[in-house]
Amino acid sequence: TAVVVPFVMIVLFTIGVIVAAQKRNYEEMVQDVSLKQLGSLTNNVTLELRNFLEAPFQINQILSHGISYHQLYPSADLSAVENYLRSSFTRIYQPLQQIDVISFGSEGAEYVGIRKEPNQKYALMVKDARTAQVLTIYQSDRISDDVRSSIADYNPKLRPWYTPIVANPEPAWSPIYANVDEKQEVTLSALAPVMDGSQLLGVMVTDVKINTFNAFLRRLHRNTTALVYLTDNQQRLIASSSKSSIVSWGTEQTQAGERLLATESINPVIAAGSEYARQHQLTQNKSTQHFSFAQDGDRYFSLLTPYHDPHGLQWYIGVIIAETDLLGTLPQKQEKSWLLGIGVSVIGILLGLVAFNRIMAPITTTANTARRIAQGDWDSQLPKPGQIYET
């Protein structure tokens, strides 16, 4: 016992140190690999998002300058602005899939807009003297008897894309809001004032169709298996690689028609990652946060990165990837190698104990016999003779 117990303890301690060192090295490796992979995906999303948003913003400023420079808004009749927007949209900016509507709202509460339709056609929306100050949406891009819908008492000056420019007449982004047309889609608008000297004439608006960015995120998910989502500074979803809608049907925290909180996402992994970020207040640091969490027995790594642009957007880009997707079968192989190592060590201990017993048996027998003889037991049986080999 005096020899065997220390031997076993030393072997077990050595095994524990080796396993702990391997586990630590694995954790350092997986953290490093996940950070690099998630960082690369985040950079890709950031670049695509910047290009996605910058083009509509620049176009909106060009259109605003054109209306002001050519003095297209002299009266309550917006036909000149209508023709300018129609020709610009259909001839120049039609390839930009993210642009949904370009429109103009005036200080006189008139409104004109051209909306892109799914069939590659356009719909005209007008509220001016020609429509008796009723917002009228036509089936085509011209005023006709073919009316799709009408909205009475529509005042563009009360819309969330108009009031920010009144408060600060500088190009900016609107809050994310729902349109009041028959589609009521979630929209982000690029805003620019139309000025006559220092006088505000109206607001030029270019609506960005956010669900077109969802298409990019879903392609990214198919190619990498990573989940990607965008949230605003209130952690409400803006876009997601998940196919589920970001609009609520009514929950405890979100009214029907509003955007869901990220923690309410239909996708359980996005919801779990967002809940972890909320509980640990990761968005309060205003810096990139790398973390891992568990969901349904699987481990996931996530990178939460702030996104800012010069025009007022304060969003977050969340990227999530599963450990199995990140490293393939390496975790399973690592676990098998640990089990194999432990098994080999146990066999080694057992073989060592057998060897020790074979070596120590004659010694302990001789010692016990000598002790009994010393105590006067002359009938003690002597151990069997053996041979000693010099090595």
What is the predicted function of each stretch?
Residues E28, F213-R219, I321-G341:
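Membrane-interface helix-start motif
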Residues K127-F213:
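Extracytoplasmic/periplasmic ligand-binding sensor regions of membrane-associated signaling proteins
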Residues D146, D153, K157-L158, G197, ...:
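Intrinsic low-complexity, intrinsically disordered coil/linker regions enriched in small/polar
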Residues G202-K209, F301-L330:
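Short, hydrophobic beta-strand elements of compact beta-sandwich sensory domains
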